[in-house]
Each structure stands twice: as C-alpha cells, then as structure tokens.
C-alpha cells in the first residue's frame, strides 16, 4: 500500500479516530501506534465487550489482521470470538482493497 494515499483515505476515519501521538479518543480509539501496541490498549478508550473478548484470545495488529478488521469489523470479531452475535462499536467497512492496503501502510507509519 501507499502510505501517502492512506493518509488521505484515513481523513474519512478522522470523525471517529485521531491519529497523532497523544491524540484524543473520540467515538473510536486513537490509532497512533496501533501496529506496535496490543489490541484494546488505547489508553482511556472503552472497548465493546466483543472486542475485549477477542483481544483476550490474543492477536496482533499486523497487516493481515488490520485487513480483516477494516474489511468487516463485525465478522472479524465473530471469527475471533466464535460468537455469531459479537458486535463492535466500529461499523464502518472500508470496501476497496487498494484503499485498505493504503490505510494499513499509513497506520504502520504511526509509531
């Protein structure tokens, strides 16, 4: 993916997420450092019970995992938890594969 293009695509995510170090939590957690911290570790953010259950089972925010999550957060959590009723606060899906790859490349620069 192209991080510069991803930064542009990620602007649409800015309604719910901040991207700068120390940025405020919004409807969603701050995404700065997402690829270097564990899931559910954004300070001060109250994750959904399903997200917490998935995080407790263990996974890392690598490119493949981010790809699965931003494709369909609900399906991702259902698969991780084994609970078909699992739900997340994030309902937005990034439909275009090239945009997902670009956003993931951008997120990887936020360290």
From Swiss-Prot:
It comes from Novispirillum itersonii. The lineage of its organism: Bacteria, Pseudomonadati, Pseudomonadota, Alphaproteobacteria, Rhodospirillales. This is Cytochrome c-550. The keyword Transport applies. Keywords: Electron transport, Heme, Iron, Metal-binding, Transport. InterPro entries: Cyt_c-like_dom (IPR009056), Cyt_c-like_dom_sf (IPR036909), Cyt_c_1A/1B (IPR002327). One of its GO terms (molecular function) is electron transfer activity. Binds 1 heme c group covalently per subunit. The keyword Amino-acid biosynthesis does not apply. Heme c binds at residues 13, 16-17, 90.
């Amino acid at each position: 993916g192209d991080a510069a293009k991803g930064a542009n695509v990620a602007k649409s995510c800015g309604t719910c997420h901040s991207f700068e170090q120390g940025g405020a939590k919004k409807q969603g957690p701050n995404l700065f450092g997402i690829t270097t911290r564990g899931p559910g570790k954004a300070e001060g953010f109250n994750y959904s019970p399903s997200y917490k259950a998935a995080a407790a089972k263990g996974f890392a925010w690598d490119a493949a995992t981010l790809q699965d999550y931003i494709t369909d957060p609900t399906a991702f959590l259902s698969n991780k938890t084994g609970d078909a009723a699992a739900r997340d606060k994030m309902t937005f899906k990034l439909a275009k594969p090239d945009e997902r790859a670009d956003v993931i490349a951008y997120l990887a620069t936020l360290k």
